Amino acid sequence: MAKLALIEREKKRARLVAKFAAKREALKAIVEDQSKSEEERYEARLELQQLPRNSNPTRQRNRCAITGRPRGTFRKFGLARNKIREIAFRGEIPGLTKASW
């Protein structure tokens, strides 16, 4: 199981991304808008750089909801592969069965 501090750090990043999402999108739109003056675009770029680093969605890491494992996490379930296997064998995920051919 991942350390609790790492899990909490990811939760904090998710909160920051949600908090600054609208502002970040507005600033990026200004930066990419060719009809704006160079000065306006430059100011928007500087303001974008002043936002917290962790408010950037690329810094987020998908983690297992149960264990906090950062790798092997399935987006559809939000769980790590080994937890999906355990839960699926118990029959707790509807429609998910072990493959046989």
Swiss-Prot record:
Belongs to the universal ribosomal protein uS14 family. Part of the 30S ribosomal subunit. Contacts proteins S3 and S10. The gene is rpsN. This is Small ribosomal subunit protein uS14. Binds 16S rRNA, required for the assembly of 30S particles and may also be responsible for determining the conformation of the 16S rRNA at the A site. PANTHER family: 30S RIBOSOMAL PROTEIN S14 (PTHR19836), SMALL RIBOSOMAL SUBUNIT PROTEIN US14M (PTHR19836:SF19). GO terms for molecular function: rRNA binding; structural constituent of ribosome. NCBIfam families: PRK08881.1 (NF006477). It comes from Burkholderia vietnamiensis (strain G4 / LMG 22486) (Burkholderia cepacia (strain R1808)). Keywords: Ribonucleoprotein, Ribosomal protein, RNA-binding, rRNA-binding. It comes from the Bacteria. GO terms for cellular component: cytoplasm; small ribosomal subunit.
